[in-house]
Amino acid sequence: GLICYSTIDVKQPATSLTIKEDKILKVVKGYSGQYTTEMGPSDTTDKITWKSDLPSVVSVNSNGNITANKVGIAKITATTTSGIKVVHYVRVKLKTPTGVKLTKKSKKITKKKKSYRVTVKWTKNTNAVKYYVYRRLSTKSSYTRIATTTKPKYIDTKVKKNKKYYYKIKAIYSNTKLNSDKTPAYA
C-alpha cells in the first residue's frame, strides 16, 4: 500500500477584540503611543488591520502605533481578519500655553496716587483662536475667568500694591472639546 501524509493549516478566527485604552483618547499634537489589544481566543490566527479616518490629524500604523499630527478628532478602527471591528477616537487638543511670565509695574496717576498693573505674557499657540485668563486672590480661593484675549498677553489693571495674585491661561480652539488644559498657577 500507499501512505499519504498531509499537513492541514487550520485557521482559528477571533471571537473577540478589545482595545485597553479609553474609548476617547485625549492627547496633544506630537503625542505618540500604541494601542494595547486583546484578541480571543488565545490561539486565534487573526491579525488586526488599523485605519484612521483622518490620517492628517492622527496617523496609525500596522502595529496600532498612533501619532497626533494636528489638532482635531480622528476615528481609529481596528478590524480582525475575521471581521470584528472596534472603533476608538483620538482627540488632539491644543497644547497648554507655555513660557508664562508676570511683570508687576506701578504708574503715577497724580503726585499722591499710583495705579498698579500686572502684565501676563505667554508663548503664542498658532492653533488657538483666543485665550482665557483666570485669576485668584489667594491659594484658598477659586480661579475666576477675568479676560478673553486673542493675543498672548494680558494686562491686569485691577491689582493692589503688595498683594499677590495667581494666574492661569487656557488656549481656546474653535471646537471646545479641543481646548488646552489650564497652565499651572503663576504668582
PLM feature spans:
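Extracytoplasmic soluble-region selector
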Residues: G1-L94
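Pro/Thr/Ser/Gly-rich low-complexity, intrinsically disordered linker/stalk tracts
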Residues: L94-N127, K161, T176-A187
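Short beta-strand segments within Ig-like beta-sandwich modules, predominantly Fibronectin type-III
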Residues: V57-V60, R145-T150
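Extracellular low-complexity, O-glycosylation-prone stalks/linkers
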Residues: N125-R145
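Beta-strand-rich modules
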Residues: D156-K177
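Short beta-strand segments enriched for Tyr within beta-sheet-rich domains
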Residues: G33, Y131, Y165-I169
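Hydrophobic core positions of the immunoglobulin-like beta-sandwich fold
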Residues: I66, Y154-T157
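Predominantly extracellular/luminal cell-surface or secreted proteins
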Residues: K51-D53, Y134-T139, K168-I172
